[in-house]
Amino acid sequence: MNQQLKNLTLPIYMDYQSTTPIDPRVMEAMLPYFTTKFGNPHSRSHSFGWEAENAVENARSMVAKVIGADSKEIIFTSGATESNNLVIKGIAKFYGNKKKHIITLVSEHKCVLNACRHLEQEGIKITYLPIKSNGIIDLETLKNAITDQTLLVSVMAVNNEIGVIQPLKEIGKICRERNVFFHSDIAQGFGKIPINVNECNIDLASISGHKIYGPKGIGALYIRKKPRVRVTPLINGGGQERGMRSGTLPTPLIVGLGIASEIAYNEMEKDTQHVNYLFDRFLNNIHSKISEVYLNGDKDQRYKGNLNLSFAGVEGESIILAIKDLAVSSGSACTSASLEPSYVLRSIGISEELAHTSIRFGIGRFTTEQEIDYAVNLVCSKIDKLRRLSPLWEMMQEGVDLKKIRWTAH
Protein backbone atom coordinates (compact mmCIF):
# COMPACT_ATOMS: atom_id res chain seq x y z
CA MET A 1 0.00 0.00 0.00
CA ASN A 2 2.94 2.35 0.67
CA GLN A 3 3.98 2.01 -2.98
CA GLN A 4 0.46 2.97 -4.06
CA LEU A 5 0.57 6.11 -1.93
CA LYS A 6 3.40 7.68 -3.92
CA ASN A 7 1.19 9.15 -6.65
CA LEU A 8 -2.07 9.39 -4.69
CA THR A 9 -3.60 12.45 -3.11
CA LEU A 10 -5.44 11.61 0.08
CA PRO A 11 -8.24 11.61 1.02
CA ILE A 12 -9.73 10.05 -2.12
CA TYR A 13 -13.10 11.49 -3.11
CA MET A 14 -15.74 8.74 -3.46
CA ASP A 15 -18.95 10.62 -2.69
CA TYR A 16 -20.06 11.52 -6.22
CA GLN A 17 -23.77 11.11 -5.39
CA SER A 18 -23.70 13.96 -2.86
CA THR A 19 -21.78 16.32 -5.15
CA THR A 20 -19.19 16.32 -7.92
CA PRO A 21 -16.04 18.40 -8.38
CA ILE A 22 -16.47 21.15 -10.95
CA ASP A 23 -15.00 20.25 -14.34
CA PRO A 24 -12.14 22.67 -15.20
CA ARG A 25 -13.78 23.34 -18.59
CA VAL A 26 -16.94 24.44 -16.78
CA MET A 27 -15.04 26.79 -14.49
CA GLU A 28 -13.18 28.31 -17.44
CA ALA A 29 -16.46 29.03 -19.26
CA MET A 30 -18.02 30.62 -16.15
CA LEU A 31 -15.22 33.02 -15.17
CA PRO A 32 -15.87 35.82 -17.73
CA TYR A 33 -19.48 36.09 -16.51
CA PHE A 34 -18.20 36.96 -13.03
CA THR A 35 -15.93 39.72 -14.37
CA THR A 36 -16.30 41.43 -17.77
CA LYS A 37 -19.59 39.85 -18.94
CA PHE A 38 -21.53 40.79 -15.82
CA GLY A 39 -24.75 42.09 -17.40
CA ASN A 40 -28.27 41.33 -16.21
CA PRO A 41 -29.88 38.98 -18.78
CA HIS A 42 -33.20 40.81 -18.28
CA SER A 43 -31.73 44.19 -19.29
CA ARG A 44 -32.87 44.55 -22.90
CA SER A 45 -31.63 48.09 -23.61
CA HIS A 46 -27.85 47.58 -23.93
CA SER A 47 -25.18 45.12 -25.05
CA PHE A 48 -24.27 43.94 -21.54
CA GLY A 49 -27.79 42.59 -21.11
CA TRP A 50 -27.96 41.15 -24.63
CA GLU A 51 -24.66 39.31 -24.10
CA ALA A 52 -25.88 37.79 -20.82
CA GLU A 53 -29.26 36.88 -22.29
CA ASN A 54 -27.57 35.16 -25.23
CA ALA A 55 -25.42 33.11 -22.83
CA VAL A 56 -28.48 32.11 -20.79
CA GLU A 57 -30.42 31.01 -23.87
CA ASN A 58 -27.46 28.99 -25.18
CA ALA A 59 -27.28 27.20 -21.84
CA ARG A 60 -31.04 26.59 -21.92
CA SER A 61 -30.66 24.90 -25.31
CA MET A 62 -27.79 22.72 -24.03
CA VAL A 63 -29.81 21.52 -21.03
CA ALA A 64 -32.83 20.79 -23.25
CA LYS A 65 -30.72 18.82 -25.75
CA VAL A 66 -29.61 16.30 -23.11
CA ILE A 67 -33.20 15.14 -22.52
CA GLY A 68 -34.66 15.71 -26.01
CA ALA A 69 -36.73 18.72 -24.93
CA ASP A 70 -37.43 22.12 -26.48
CA SER A 71 -35.44 24.97 -24.92
CA LYS A 72 -38.72 26.80 -24.18
CA GLU A 73 -39.61 23.92 -21.83
CA ILE A 74 -36.62 24.56 -19.52
CA ILE A 75 -36.79 26.96 -16.59
CA PHE A 76 -33.84 27.65 -14.29
CA THR A 77 -34.06 27.14 -10.52
CA SER A 78 -31.60 26.99 -7.63
CA GLY A 79 -31.39 23.19 -7.84
CA ALA A 80 -33.32 19.93 -7.83
CA THR A 81 -34.76 20.51 -4.35
CA GLU A 82 -36.44 23.72 -5.51
CA SER A 83 -37.53 22.07 -8.77
CA ASN A 84 -39.12 19.17 -6.87
CA ASN A 85 -40.92 21.54 -4.51
CA LEU A 86 -42.14 23.69 -7.40
CA VAL A 87 -43.57 20.64 -9.17
CA ILE A 88 -45.23 18.93 -6.22
CA LYS A 89 -46.60 22.00 -4.46
CA GLY A 90 -47.16 24.03 -7.64
CA ILE A 91 -49.11 21.37 -9.51
CA ALA A 92 -51.23 20.55 -6.44
CA LYS A 93 -52.06 24.22 -6.01
CA PHE A 94 -52.99 24.71 -9.67
CA TYR A 95 -55.07 21.55 -10.18
CA GLY A 96 -55.99 20.78 -6.54
CA ASN A 97 -59.63 21.78 -6.93
CA LYS A 98 -60.03 19.07 -9.62
CA LYS A 99 -57.79 16.22 -8.43
CA LYS A 100 -56.39 15.60 -4.96
CA HIS A 101 -54.21 12.48 -5.17
CA ILE A 102 -50.45 12.12 -5.73
CA ILE A 103 -48.44 8.88 -5.98
CA THR A 104 -44.74 8.55 -5.14
CA LEU A 105 -42.32 5.91 -3.82
CA VAL A 106 -41.19 5.28 -0.24
CA SER A 107 -37.60 5.48 -1.53
CA GLU A 108 -37.76 8.96 -3.09
CA HIS A 109 -35.41 11.78 -2.06
CA LYS A 110 -36.27 13.50 1.22
CA CYS A 111 -37.27 16.73 -0.54
CA VAL A 112 -39.99 14.89 -2.50
CA LEU A 113 -41.24 12.99 0.54
CA ASN A 114 -41.29 16.09 2.75
CA ALA A 115 -43.04 18.17 0.07
CA CYS A 116 -45.68 15.43 -0.12
CA ARG A 117 -46.06 15.39 3.67
CA HIS A 118 -46.57 19.15 3.55
CA LEU A 119 -49.40 18.65 1.04
CA GLU A 120 -51.05 16.02 3.25
CA GLN A 121 -51.61 18.78 5.81
CA GLU A 122 -53.47 20.69 3.09
CA GLY A 123 -55.87 17.87 2.28
CA ILE A 124 -54.03 16.20 -0.61
CA LYS A 125 -54.00 12.40 -0.43
CA ILE A 126 -50.52 10.89 -0.93
CA THR A 127 -49.86 7.23 -1.73
CA TYR A 128 -46.31 6.07 -0.91
CA LEU A 129 -45.79 2.93 -2.99
CA PRO A 130 -43.47 0.18 -1.71
CA ILE A 131 -40.63 -1.05 -3.92
CA LYS A 132 -39.35 -4.55 -4.64
CA SER A 133 -36.31 -5.99 -2.85
CA ASN A 134 -34.12 -4.93 -5.79
CA GLY A 135 -35.23 -1.31 -5.35
CA ILE A 136 -37.40 -1.19 -8.49
CA ILE A 137 -41.06 -0.16 -8.63
CA ASP A 138 -43.72 -2.83 -9.19
CA LEU A 139 -45.65 -1.60 -12.24
CA GLU A 140 -48.80 -3.55 -11.36
CA THR A 141 -48.84 -1.90 -7.93
CA LEU A 142 -48.60 1.48 -9.66
CA LYS A 143 -51.46 0.66 -12.04
CA ASN A 144 -53.67 -0.42 -9.15
CA ALA A 145 -52.87 2.72 -7.13
CA ILE A 146 -54.03 5.17 -9.83
CA THR A 147 -57.59 6.45 -9.42
CA ASP A 148 -59.70 9.04 -11.24
CA GLN A 149 -58.50 11.51 -8.57
CA THR A 150 -54.79 10.93 -9.29
CA LEU A 151 -53.09 14.12 -10.44
CA LEU A 152 -49.39 13.24 -10.42
CA VAL A 153 -46.98 10.31 -10.23
CA SER A 154 -43.48 11.27 -9.02
CA VAL A 155 -40.72 8.67 -9.44
CA MET A 156 -37.00 9.45 -9.55
CA ALA A 157 -34.87 8.19 -12.44
CA VAL A 158 -31.83 7.02 -10.44
CA ASN A 159 -31.95 6.53 -6.68
CA ASN A 160 -29.42 8.68 -4.84
CA GLU A 161 -28.68 6.05 -2.19
CA ILE A 162 -28.66 2.72 -4.05
CA GLY A 163 -28.32 3.80 -7.69
CA VAL A 164 -31.17 1.74 -9.16
CA ILE A 165 -32.71 2.97 -12.42
CA GLN A 166 -36.51 2.99 -12.49
CA PRO A 167 -38.35 1.90 -15.69
CA LEU A 168 -39.27 5.43 -16.80
CA LYS A 169 -40.71 4.44 -20.21
CA GLU A 170 -43.11 1.94 -18.67
CA ILE A 171 -44.15 4.35 -15.91
CA GLY A 172 -44.65 7.14 -18.45
CA LYS A 173 -46.78 4.89 -20.67
CA ILE A 174 -49.06 3.99 -17.74
CA CYS A 175 -49.40 7.66 -16.73
CA ARG A 176 -50.19 8.82 -20.28
CA GLU A 177 -52.82 6.09 -20.71
CA ARG A 178 -54.48 7.10 -17.43
CA ASN A 179 -54.24 10.86 -18.08
CA VAL A 180 -51.95 11.46 -15.09
CA PHE A 181 -48.96 13.83 -15.05
CA PHE A 182 -45.57 12.11 -14.68
CA HIS A 183 -42.75 13.86 -12.80
CA SER A 184 -39.26 12.46 -12.42
CA ASP A 185 -36.43 13.75 -10.26
CA ILE A 186 -33.64 13.02 -12.76
CA ALA A 187 -30.85 14.75 -10.78
CA GLN A 188 -28.79 11.55 -10.40
CA GLY A 189 -29.39 10.38 -13.99
CA PHE A 190 -29.24 13.59 -16.06
CA GLY A 191 -26.22 13.46 -18.36
CA LYS A 192 -25.23 10.01 -17.06
CA ILE A 193 -27.85 7.71 -18.57
CA PRO A 194 -29.93 8.33 -21.73
CA ILE A 195 -33.24 10.00 -20.77
CA ASN A 196 -35.61 11.29 -23.45
CA VAL A 197 -38.65 13.09 -22.04
CA ASN A 198 -40.76 12.35 -25.13
CA GLU A 199 -39.91 8.65 -25.34
CA CYS A 200 -40.59 8.31 -21.60
CA ASN A 201 -43.72 10.53 -21.61
CA ILE A 202 -42.21 12.62 -18.79
CA ASP A 203 -44.18 15.82 -18.17
CA LEU A 204 -41.89 17.39 -15.57
CA ALA A 205 -38.25 16.66 -14.68
CA SER A 206 -35.93 18.08 -12.01
CA ILE A 207 -32.25 18.73 -12.76
CA SER A 208 -29.24 19.70 -10.61
CA GLY A 209 -26.00 21.36 -11.73
CA HIS A 210 -23.64 20.09 -9.06
CA LYS A 211 -24.37 16.42 -9.77
CA ILE A 212 -22.89 16.72 -13.29
CA TYR A 213 -19.58 18.51 -12.56
CA GLY A 214 -21.25 21.93 -12.66
CA PRO A 215 -21.68 24.61 -9.99
CA LYS A 216 -23.82 24.40 -6.87
CA GLY A 217 -26.84 26.66 -6.50
CA ILE A 218 -28.21 26.11 -10.01
CA GLY A 219 -30.66 23.60 -11.42
CA ALA A 220 -33.49 23.39 -13.90
CA LEU A 221 -37.02 22.15 -14.31
CA TYR A 222 -38.38 20.70 -17.53
CA ILE A 223 -42.09 21.52 -17.93
CA ARG A 224 -43.88 20.06 -20.96
CA LYS A 225 -45.59 22.56 -23.26
CA LYS A 226 -47.62 20.10 -25.40
CA PRO A 227 -49.83 18.91 -23.79
CA ARG A 228 -49.35 21.90 -21.52
CA VAL A 229 -48.60 21.41 -17.84
CA ARG A 230 -49.32 24.26 -15.41
CA VAL A 231 -47.86 24.97 -11.97
CA THR A 232 -48.49 27.77 -9.50
CA PRO A 233 -45.14 29.50 -8.78
CA LEU A 234 -43.53 29.34 -5.34
CA ILE A 235 -41.80 32.71 -5.81
CA ASN A 236 -43.55 35.89 -6.95
CA GLY A 237 -41.70 38.80 -8.49
CA GLY A 238 -40.81 40.14 -11.91
CA GLY A 239 -42.27 37.19 -13.80
CA GLN A 240 -39.01 35.75 -15.14
CA GLU A 241 -38.84 32.17 -16.45
CA ARG A 242 -42.30 32.18 -18.06
CA GLY A 243 -43.72 33.52 -14.80
CA MET A 244 -42.86 30.32 -12.97
CA ARG A 245 -39.67 31.36 -11.18
CA SER A 246 -39.17 35.07 -10.59
CA GLY A 247 -35.79 36.58 -9.73
CA THR A 248 -32.71 37.78 -11.62
CA LEU A 249 -31.02 34.82 -13.25
CA PRO A 250 -27.45 33.99 -12.05
CA THR A 251 -25.76 34.09 -15.47
CA PRO A 252 -22.38 32.57 -14.40
CA LEU A 253 -24.07 29.58 -12.77
CA ILE A 254 -26.38 29.05 -15.74
CA VAL A 255 -23.41 29.16 -18.13
CA GLY A 256 -21.76 26.53 -15.91
CA LEU A 257 -24.84 24.30 -15.99
CA GLY A 258 -25.03 24.68 -19.77
CA ILE A 259 -21.39 23.73 -20.39
CA ALA A 260 -21.59 20.87 -17.87
CA SER A 261 -24.68 19.59 -19.71
CA GLU A 262 -22.96 19.84 -23.09
CA ILE A 263 -19.89 17.95 -21.83
CA ALA A 264 -22.07 15.28 -20.19
CA TYR A 265 -24.05 14.84 -23.42
CA ASN A 266 -20.96 14.60 -25.64
CA GLU A 267 -18.99 12.35 -23.28
CA MET A 268 -21.79 10.18 -21.85
CA GLU A 269 -20.61 7.00 -23.57
CA LYS A 270 -16.99 7.56 -22.53
CA ASP A 271 -17.97 8.38 -18.92
CA THR A 272 -20.25 5.32 -18.76
CA GLN A 273 -17.51 2.94 -19.96
CA HIS A 274 -15.07 4.44 -17.44
CA VAL A 275 -17.50 4.18 -14.52
CA ASN A 276 -18.68 0.66 -15.44
CA TYR A 277 -15.11 -0.63 -15.66
CA LEU A 278 -14.19 0.80 -12.24
CA PHE A 279 -17.45 -0.49 -10.69
CA ASP A 280 -16.70 -4.04 -11.84
CA ARG A 281 -13.07 -3.78 -10.72
CA PHE A 282 -14.06 -2.51 -7.27
CA LEU A 283 -16.86 -5.01 -6.68
CA ASN A 284 -15.03 -8.08 -8.02
CA ASN A 285 -11.89 -7.34 -6.00
CA ILE A 286 -13.87 -6.72 -2.81
CA HIS A 287 -15.73 -10.02 -3.25
CA SER A 288 -12.47 -11.90 -3.91
CA LYS A 289 -10.91 -10.67 -0.65
CA ILE A 290 -13.71 -10.65 1.96
CA SER A 291 -16.98 -12.53 2.49
CA GLU A 292 -20.48 -11.42 3.46
CA VAL A 293 -20.47 -8.21 1.43
CA TYR A 294 -23.80 -7.37 -0.19
CA LEU A 295 -24.57 -4.98 -3.05
CA ASN A 296 -27.76 -3.07 -2.28
CA GLY A 297 -30.10 -2.53 -5.22
CA ASP A 298 -30.36 -4.32 -8.54
CA LYS A 299 -26.91 -5.18 -9.95
CA ASP A 300 -27.82 -4.62 -13.60
CA GLN A 301 -30.62 -2.04 -13.62
CA ARG A 302 -28.49 0.61 -11.94
CA TYR A 303 -26.14 3.53 -12.55
CA LYS A 304 -22.80 1.92 -11.77
CA GLY A 305 -21.27 5.09 -10.37
CA ASN A 306 -23.15 4.13 -7.20
CA LEU A 307 -21.90 1.21 -5.12
CA ASN A 308 -23.93 0.80 -1.95
CA LEU A 309 -22.44 -2.10 0.00
CA SER A 310 -23.35 -3.71 3.31
CA PHE A 311 -20.56 -5.35 5.31
CA ALA A 312 -22.07 -7.87 7.73
CA GLY A 313 -20.76 -7.86 11.28
CA VAL A 314 -19.51 -4.27 11.54
CA GLU A 315 -21.05 -0.82 12.04
CA GLY A 316 -21.14 1.63 9.14
CA GLU A 317 -19.98 4.47 11.38
CA SER A 318 -16.94 2.48 12.54
CA ILE A 319 -16.07 1.66 8.91
CA ILE A 320 -16.13 5.35 7.96
CA LEU A 321 -13.80 6.18 10.86
CA ALA A 322 -11.50 3.31 9.88
CA ILE A 323 -11.30 4.31 6.21
CA LYS A 324 -10.88 8.05 6.76
CA ASP A 325 -8.63 8.20 3.67
CA LEU A 326 -11.80 7.68 1.60
CA ALA A 327 -14.52 10.34 1.41
CA VAL A 328 -17.63 8.13 1.43
CA SER A 329 -21.13 8.28 2.86
CA SER A 330 -23.13 6.02 5.15
CA GLY A 331 -26.36 7.19 3.50
CA SER A 332 -27.88 10.24 1.84
CA ALA A 333 -25.86 13.34 2.81
CA CYS A 334 -29.13 15.07 3.68
CA THR A 335 -29.83 12.48 6.38
CA SER A 336 -26.39 11.13 7.30
CA ALA A 337 -26.31 13.22 10.48
CA SER A 338 -28.91 10.79 11.79
CA LEU A 339 -27.91 7.45 13.33
CA GLU A 340 -31.20 5.94 12.15
CA PRO A 341 -30.69 3.26 9.47
CA SER A 342 -31.31 4.45 5.91
CA TYR A 343 -35.02 4.53 5.08
CA VAL A 344 -34.17 3.53 1.49
CA LEU A 345 -32.37 0.38 2.63
CA ARG A 346 -35.18 -0.45 5.04
CA SER A 347 -37.67 -0.02 2.17
CA ILE A 348 -35.98 -2.82 0.18
CA GLY A 349 -36.32 -5.17 3.14
CA ILE A 350 -32.80 -5.01 4.53
CA SER A 351 -32.60 -5.69 8.26
CA GLU A 352 -31.83 -2.83 10.61
CA GLU A 353 -28.53 -4.52 11.57
CA LEU A 354 -27.36 -4.88 7.96
CA ALA A 355 -28.60 -1.41 7.01
CA HIS A 356 -26.36 0.02 9.73
CA THR A 357 -23.32 -1.58 8.03
CA SER A 358 -23.88 0.04 4.64
CA ILE A 359 -21.46 2.39 2.91
CA ARG A 360 -22.10 4.23 -0.37
CA PHE A 361 -19.05 4.44 -2.62
CA GLY A 362 -19.32 6.90 -5.52
CA ILE A 363 -17.34 6.54 -8.74
CA GLY A 364 -17.15 9.40 -11.23
CA ARG A 365 -15.43 11.07 -14.16
CA PHE A 366 -12.24 11.82 -12.23
CA THR A 367 -11.91 8.53 -10.30
CA THR A 368 -8.78 6.59 -11.31
CA GLU A 369 -7.97 2.89 -11.42
CA GLN A 370 -5.19 3.50 -8.89
CA GLU A 371 -7.67 5.09 -6.48
CA ILE A 372 -10.02 2.12 -6.84
CA ASP A 373 -7.24 -0.38 -6.09
CA TYR A 374 -6.13 1.63 -3.06
CA ALA A 375 -9.73 1.85 -1.83
CA VAL A 376 -10.27 -1.91 -2.19
CA ASN A 377 -7.12 -2.77 -0.24
CA LEU A 378 -7.91 -0.24 2.48
CA VAL A 379 -11.54 -1.34 2.87
CA CYS A 380 -10.70 -5.04 2.96
CA SER A 381 -7.89 -4.68 5.51
CA LYS A 382 -10.00 -2.47 7.80
CA ILE A 383 -13.12 -4.65 7.54
CA ASP A 384 -11.03 -7.70 8.37
CA LYS A 385 -9.58 -5.93 11.42
CA LEU A 386 -12.99 -4.66 12.62
CA ARG A 387 -14.50 -8.11 12.25
CA ARG A 388 -11.71 -9.69 14.30
CA LEU A 389 -12.54 -7.21 17.06
CA SER A 390 -16.29 -7.79 16.81
CA PRO A 391 -17.99 -10.33 19.09
CA LEU A 392 -21.05 -10.08 16.82
CA TRP A 393 -19.03 -11.27 13.81
CA GLU A 394 -17.69 -14.19 15.85
CA MET A 395 -21.21 -15.15 16.88
CA MET A 396 -22.41 -14.91 13.27
CA GLN A 397 -19.62 -17.24 12.15
CA GLU A 398 -20.75 -19.72 14.79
CA GLY A 399 -24.25 -19.65 13.30
CA VAL A 400 -25.92 -17.62 16.05
CA ASP A 401 -29.04 -15.75 14.88
CA LEU A 402 -28.48 -12.26 16.28
CA LYS A 403 -32.18 -11.41 15.99
CA LYS A 404 -33.05 -14.09 18.54
CA ILE A 405 -30.60 -12.92 21.19
CA ARG A 406 -32.20 -11.31 24.23
CA TRP A 407 -29.80 -8.71 25.58
CA THR A 408 -30.01 -8.03 29.32
CA ALA A 409 -29.23 -4.70 30.92
CA HIS A 410 -26.65 -4.51 33.72
Curated annotation (Swiss-Prot):
Record: active site: 334
GO MF assignments: 2 iron, 2 sulfur cluster binding; cysteine desulfurase activity; metal ion binding; pyridoxal phosphate binding
Binding of pyridoxal 5'-phosphate, residues: 80-81, 160, 188, 208-210, 248
TM stretches of this protein: none
A cellular component term, taken from the record's GO annotations: L-cysteine desulfurase complex
Residues annotated to bind [2Fe-2S] cluster: 334
Gene Ontology biological process: [2Fe-2S] cluster assembly
Entries under InterPro entries matching the protein: Aminotrans_V_dom, Aminotrans_V_PyrdxlP_BS, Cys_deSase_IscS, Cysteine_dSase, PyrdxlP-dep_Trfase, PyrdxlP-dep_Trfase_major, PyrdxlP-dep_Trfase_small
NCBIfam families: IscS (TIGR02006), PRK02948.1 (NF002806), PRK14012.1 (NF010611)
Subunit structure: Homodimer. Forms a heterotetramer with IscU, interacts with other sulfur acceptors.
Family listed: Belongs to the class-V pyridoxal-phosphate-dependent aminotransferase family. NifS/IscS subfamily.
Name of this chain's protein: Cysteine desulfurase IscS
Origin species: Rickettsia prowazekii (strain Madrid E)
